[in-house]
């Protein structure tokens, strides 16, 4: 899983870009975690608890995207995927799930979060 982090020099906003199959993770990092070290720390704490066997799973529901963790993987998905009545959507308006969800190993997410944490500190 490849990624790159950037900070806008004009307004200070942060963004993340992930490899094609993990694009939604970049949006989750930028939009849900953003420049909030406490949010990143909370997810890292949950990962540590899962790895220590203290938790079996953990979920964080955000405004646009949610994160689910279990003992093996992390899954980020757009909350719009909870839309149950796909029949009401026109053919051209169907939701393209592949761009709206991605999974990776728990250790991969942990490494990306640690890099994000370091990026936030280094670019302040």
Swiss-Prot record:
InterPro entries: UPF0231 (IPR008249). Belongs to the UPF0231 family. HAMAP family: UPF0231 (MF_01053). This is UPF0231 protein Sama_0645.
């Amino acid at each position: 899983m490849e990624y790159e982090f950037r900070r806008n020099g004009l307004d200070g906003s942060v963004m993340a870009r992930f490899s094609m199959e993990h694009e939604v993770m970049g949006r989750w990092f930028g939009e849900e975690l953003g420049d909030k070290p406490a949010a990143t720390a909370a997810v890292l704490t949950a990962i540590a608890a899962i790895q220590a066997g203290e938790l079996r799973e953990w979920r964080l529901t955000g405004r646009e995207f949610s994160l689910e963790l279990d003992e093996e993987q992390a899954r980020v998905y757009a909350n719009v995927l909870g839309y149950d009545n796909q029949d009401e959507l026109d053919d051209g308006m169907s939701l393209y799930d592949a761009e709206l969800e991605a999974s990776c190993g728990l250790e991969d997410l942990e490494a990306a979060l640690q890099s994000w944490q370091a990026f936030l500190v280094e670019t302040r």
